[in-house]
Amino acid sequence: MAFQHGLSGLNAASKNLDVIGHNIANANTTGFKASRAEFADMVASAIGGAGGSNVGIGVQVAAVAQQFTQGNLTVTGNTLDVAINGSGFFMLQQPDGSSAYTRAGNFKLDKDGDLKTNSGARVLGYPIDPATGLRTATVPGPLNFPSSQPIAAKQTTTVTAAFNLDARAYDAAGVPATPGPPPTPAIPPTPRATYGTSINVFDSQGVAVPVTLYFQKTATDNEWEVYDSLDTAATPVGTITFDNNGAITGPVAPAPATGFGLTLSVDPSPPNPNNLPAFNVLVNLDDVTQFGSKFAVSDLSQDGYASGELTGINIEASGMIMARYSNGMTRAEGQVALANFRNPQGLMAVGNNNWVETFESGQPVMGTPTDGNFGALRSGALEDSNVDLTAELVNMMTAQRTYQANA
């Protein structure tokens, strides 16, 4: 019986050393989760014997339990390196079509625009409609970003302006001289206060057209004339009015727009080699004020842009994948999917930093980052192995002494 005790102790200690050695070997493996050997005693059973007469016959390894604690995050600066801060697993489609799960987010784009792991598995997520930002599928599929798809130019339809016109400005006609007695000198007219600001708008082919807006005080209280200039000549386009509190009262924007605004007619020429027609641009004036402070522009933006080529992608904390284009635009192209399990320790490790589901793990619960109990993503970072190297070295020495004691 003593031989059985020692042999079981050797086997258990050897298995423990295997587990510890595997942990130490993967101390620098991205997304690796350490394991722990768990032991149970063995007892010889006697039919009909009294409980106190059972004799222990040694030890056995009851389980090798994976430890899914969070690993540290290391910043890499690579936008396709993604770490999960919290619970969840990236969902993968392996080359043979089967499903796998991983915590290692060191992804790559292949020549076809597929987002893949180092082992060639495709990363799964949800396709997004760029126009609405909403999902177009309920089941995750392989994420793909073909580099050959440029973003088309968009003609400007609206300019949004926010600025203050100085309420202290006025337009005085002046006073002529009088002969007296006593004579009074002439008071010259005060120059009309004029302010201006410029912005580029885009025609239907994405060509930038510079537009300058001028605002000139009239002789009427709380009233300003508006001019636009596409070249050198200024063209009147309307009048802005305010109440005594400095809030804009007109003009009312043309339908179907609401609020306050003016319409500009923008002629792409010159130069205009393709003879594009003039197009209208609504200038939204809802946030224009007339207070007793200097003229200042706080916002001047427009909704058009030139065409652009894909230059890269960013992955947000929510898993939303934003494509970056050479024209400065960004567009939602997909969303990374995550999965979780009722019993993550029931997952089976299959190598290449991957796990597959088993009966013990339960079926995956799918979702997206920051949704419910799922963790957030951090682009430009990777999750380190959660192996505590110091603790593992101590465990190894203890396991070696145990092995020696049973030899």
Q: In which residue ranges do the predicted regions lie?
A:
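N-terminal intrinsically disordered, low-complexity, charge/repeat-rich segments that act as generic
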Residues: 1-35
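Amphipathic alpha-helical coiled-coil segments and their boundaries
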Residues: 3-6, 392, 399
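Amphipathic alpha-helical coiled-coil segments
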Residues: 10-13, 17, 389, 396, ...
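Small/polar low-complexity and glycine-rich loop motifs
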Residues: 22, 33-388, 393-395
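Acidic/polar, glycine-anchored loop/turn motif associated with catalytic or activation segments
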Residues: 406
